[in-house]
Amino acid sequence: MTTESGSDSESKPDQEAEPQEAAGAQGRAGAPVPEPPKEEQQQALEQFAAAAAHSTPVRREVTDKEQEFAARAAKQLEYQQLEDDKLSQKSSSSKLSRSPLKIVKKPKSMQCKVILLDGSEYTCDVEKRSRGQVLFDKVCEHLNLLEKDYFGLTYRDAENQKNWLDPAKEIKKQVRSGAWHFSFNVKFYPPDPAQLSEDITRYYLCLQLRDDIVSGRLPCSFVTLALLGSYTVQSELGDYDPDECGSDYISEFRFAPNHTKELEDKVIELHKSHRGMTPAEAEMHFLENAKKLSMYGVDLHHAKDSEGVEIMLGVCASGLLIYRDRLRINRFAWPKVLKISYKRNNFYIKIRPGEFEQFESTIGFKLPNHRAAKRLWKVCVEHHTFFRLLLPEAPPKKFLTLGSKFRYSGRTQAQTRRASALIDRPAPYFERSSSKRYTMSRSLDGEVGTGQYATTKGISQTNLITTVTPEKKAEEERDEEEDKRRKGEEVTPISAIRHEGKSPGLGTDSCPLSPPSTHCAPTSPTELRRRCKENDCKLPGYEPSRAEHLPGEPALDSDGPGRPYLGDQDVAFSYRQQTGKGTTLFSFSLQLPESFPSLLDDDGYLSFPNLSETNLLPQSLQHYLPIRSPSLVPCFLFIFFFLLSASFSVPYALTLSFPLALCLCYLEPKAASLSASLDNDPSDSSEEETDSERTDTAADGETTATESDQEEDAELKAQELEKTQDDLMKHQTNISELKRTFLETSTDTAVTNEWEKRLSTSPVRLAARQEDAPMIEPLVPEETKQSSGEKLMDGSEIFSLLESARKPTEFIGGVTSTSQSWVQKMETKTESSGIETEPTVHHLPLSTEKVVQETVLVEERRVVHASGDASYSAGDSGDAAAQPAFTGIKGKEGSALTEGAKEEGGEEVAKAVLEQEETAAASRERQEEQSAAIHISETLEQKPHFESSTVKTETISFGSVSPGGVKLEISTKEVPVVHTETKTITYESSQVDPGTDLEPGVLMSAQTITSETTSTTTTTHITKTVKGGISETRIEKRIVITGDADIDHDQALAQAIKEAKEQHPDMSVTKVVVHKETEITPEDGED
């Protein structure tokens, strides 16, 4: 096991070479083997000289010591080579020696700069593929901090928003662009700082709270600011010494966003009283007072509620808080929250049902974007896990999981306290730095505070997660100015791309161009991304100018003047024409953006981009296409693969999938709003939003509630009602179009009548609810929702007076064509029998004959109110319901087919159907013409009699003008009629408290109980409110009786009132509403 190096060793005898070369190899290997004794070396030299003097070489006698030395050297060399073989698997140098052709990359290291809580900077190097925990451990080791679970690192993303660095993920996957700059901050504010084990932990918590106060994130009163400032001075400077402390010894400190001389004087006065207090005691007193502040440890996020009102969502140790205008309006403790989730930019909280609630409620909030919703969701998950759980929840390990795999990976508060109790090191020595970082007179949002509580703007404009020091703010402003100046120098005059031929779609978007390049060197994708980043600016318009090229410029120059750039997430195509030596070359080239939009979010789930951001379509086309729909990409992919699997033709699938996806996305919001309008009461439009108004009573006895929607102004109600009615008109038009298509393809009369019967239910009920009358709609057993717009009146007397009134509403739909426009200029003859109708069509925009079945709806509704008078008043018998017919309006050409509606009491009842100026006149004419057909007269004797809601369906067939101009006349003989009789009685007590709606009460609880039998459905809604210290309970019952036999409604009403009084003897009945709806056969209606 010896090695020979050099030619001299070859000439020596083997016996002499062995020990010497073994020693030389041993020295080269660096093995710590002792050298041979000097006597042995001298003896060997003498023997070698003696042997060299003779002509014949004499063999040297090898002593025992030399043999042992050689054997020991050989063993050492074998051991060293064995160690080298083991290290070769790990050492890059061994890899190079073993495989010299293989190039081993050294791990790249990134320089990280961390801003600490005292304003200083800490710089370190970490590997590029390191996880966040590595950097966080280095920072905590630098700070000599053991209780590090309360702290974290933050960074800014591309949108300049602060995010918490996830210690379980690689840093380069989180900080995707820019330098690695971080801030060290408190992440979880301990509810009881006295339970922290070390003073150094409390010191850094104090530094964070001082920054929160100065930045405006932690608002305080003047007295609290002075007290906390005095503890700060005591901790930093020690006892007050009049000899050393001048009048301005605290001028370098910063105590509040709006620092005043009065505040300094108060701080000095309180500082004198803290004599003898150690810095640790001063910091403890500081924390004991700071933890009592209402915004202590609250991480605020901008959001909007379901009505679009700007609010702030705060996450803290106790739960979720909701703020509006700096006031907390609601609180959801963690035990109350059942589930938190987000979808796109919506954030949802599912609330656990309370004591008097049967089902859980979900409250939704809208955040600025998807990333903000995800950021808020992560903060909630981390806070809930840290403060509420004993052990962190392990992330799901399934291959396919629904929802995000993100879980809090650190230790919980319980684990941290157990670990802190085991700390046995002596108290670390640390130097408390002076608060010179607060010397700037401006608050951290860049504006000088104007008042004691002028912190709302600071809270709303600054990022509410971490601390920003004035030095860093100034540095960031300087960096932004330098970037703007650099961009201004680099941007060249803009030249547009000239588009010719068959590509009109390209070139309609605004895109700045890259600076011209005079060389033709190949450009790598990295260089493209760098240049794209340098030219990252967008223009409002597209200026047409001609792009000129050099004759010798190559066709695929990737950085030429004709190079469009649409942004970081856009793919730009360049269409360029070059002329040189009589040849024309057309080239399409693809410019890579700085970073392709990833279809996977941080958790590995699909998140499709918004196609409106790509600007691949002109603005005029984007206005008509649902390109902003987030469902467009999923719909396109689904339809494409479906068609591809069915037809095995890629062109066929591509041709049909995009138009079909556009149609689906176009119909998606309309279908959702249509179903919501047909299924829900317009006055219940805020029903889902009022779930957030349920009270939250926490364990500490604090109760907060939101303001009820019932306290909104009447003007807002009117505006919402008008909007709802306009939407109903649009939906009615869509229904007529669907009905027309249905009737063209169907010939079954029974099916047609059933279709008409179904269509004739919802529009009447919806259109008739125009006035804000306290009326309950006819309920089917499935409809048990409580209308939130109804007001209950206080009083004790029932049946004192019955006042009868009629509020008829006539709903006559129009005949629609394929373009959803009304038929123009139609005259109608109506015979006295009212059965045969002969319409003459003068003009129809269709060239083919259409048979349209029209639904004509007439509803007459009568409401009787009970008041305090003891006499009966007869109903107005002069008004009669009009039989529907088509009325031609004499006027200018193009006037639409009108509908009539009666005016009673100056109210326009038919406003929700169509707003026509001739409504009242047409209604009177029709009423006079057809008074003989339907005559209603009634007298009220001992109980009121009603003739209500008549729904009639006529089948009217007519044809269009033929190409030759021949007029076609078609008359109908069969008139299927469906009659629905509806009666509504309202009893109200006479004693009405005038201050009922003026003073809002605090909603304590709300309970809904539903019990259903074969023929009766009873819904009980119990509402408890606190008004002026007085608890008030209101119980509202809805009883729906269904059956084939006749039902005595008077007896049922009396029985219901009797049961209510028996069940609640200490309560009074204030309002009774009876709504009767019976369906009679067509034979009875014709009689």
Curated annotation (Swiss-Prot):
Positions with biased composition (Low complexity): 20-32, 698-707
Annotated GO CC locations: cell junction; cell-cell junction; ciliary basal body; cilium; cytoskeleton; cytosol; glutamatergic synapse; juxtaparanode region of axon
Compositionally biased residues, Polar residues: 459-469, 516-526, 947-960
Region (Spectrin--actin-binding): 514-860
Region of interest (Disordered), residue spans: 1-43, 459-529, 541-563, 675-715, 937-965
Tissue and organ distribution: Expressed at high levels in brain, with lower levels in kidney, intestine, and testis. Detected in lung.
Stretch list, region Hydrophilic: 394-513
Sites bearing N-acetylthreonine, chain numbering: 2
Residues bearing the modification N-acetylmethionine: 1
Modified residues (Phosphothreonine): 469, 492, 706, 1081
Modified residues (Phosphoserine): 88, 420, 443, 460, 708, 960, 962
GO biological process: actomyosin structure organization; apoptotic process; cortical actin cytoskeleton organization; cortical cytoskeleton organization; myelin maintenance; neuron projection morphogenesis; paranodal junction assembly; protein localization to juxtaparanode region of axon
Tagged with keyword Membrane: yes
Compartment(s): Cytoplasm, Cytoskeleton; Cell junction; Cell membrane; Cytoplasm
Keywords: Acetylation, Actin-binding, Apoptosis, Cell junction, Cell membrane, Cytoplasm, Cytoskeleton, Membrane, Phosphoprotein, Tumor suppressor
Function: Tumor suppressor that inhibits cell proliferation and promotes apoptosis. Modulates the activity of protein arginine N-methyltransferases, including PRMT3 and PRMT5.
Name by which UniProt lists this protein: Band 4.1-like protein 3
Annotated source species: Homo sapiens (Human)
